[in-house]
């Protein structure tokens, strides 16, 4: 894949970046270099390599999957100026 001057101008317009005609060839070369690097990645043999979700080994902390009310309703509403049955009461703003 190759980026032409019109594509550089279009990308600049979409990104709302002012690009002069003198800058277009330089940016075209940089974008093409980036695309060439990405295309090289498709040549890497990854057969037998397990997909990674993180570069560092991590184990997810697990807990029992049980339904509860969170057991903190009183703590949540204790600093609210007005509550009723564990709900926040707010002033009416729409008539």
UniProtKB/Swiss-Prot annotation:
Domain of life: Bacteria
Residue ranges that the Swiss-Prot or TrEMBL entry lists as coiled coil: none
GO-annotated biological processes: glutaminyl-tRNAGln biosynthesis via transamidation; regulation of translational fidelity; translation
Statement: the UniProt record of this protein carries the keyword Zinc-finger: no
PANTHER family found in the cross-reference section: GLUTAMYL-TRNA(GLN) AMIDOTRANSFERASE SUBUNIT C, MITOCHONDRIAL
Described function: Allows the formation of correctly charged Asn-tRNA(Asn) or Gln-tRNA(Gln) through the transamidation of misacylated Asp-tRNA(Asn) or Glu-tRNA(Gln) in organisms which lack either or both of asparaginyl-tRNA or glutaminyl-tRNA synthetases. The reaction takes place in the presence of glutamine and ATP through an activated phospho-Asp-tRNA(Asn) or phospho-Glu-tRNA(Gln).
Family in the record: Belongs to the GatC family.
Entry protein name: Aspartyl/glutamyl-tRNA(Asn/Gln) amidotransferase subunit C
Organism per entry: Bradyrhizobium sp. (strain BTAi1 / ATCC BAA-1182)
Lineage start: Bacteria, Pseudomonadati, Pseudomonadota, Alphaproteobacteria, Hyphomicrobiales
């Amino acid at each position: 894949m190759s980026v032409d001057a019109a594509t550089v101008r279009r990308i600049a317009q979409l990104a709302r970046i002012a690009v002069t005609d003198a800058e277009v060839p330089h940016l075209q070369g940089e974008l093409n270099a980036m695309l060439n690097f990405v295309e090289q990645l498709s040549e890497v043999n990854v057969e037998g390599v397990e997909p990674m979700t993180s570069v560092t080994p991590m184990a997810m902390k697990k807990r029992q999957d049980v339904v509860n009310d969170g057991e903190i309703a009183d703590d949540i509403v204790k600093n609210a100026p007005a509550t009723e049955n564990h709900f926040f009461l707010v002033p009416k703003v729409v008539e």
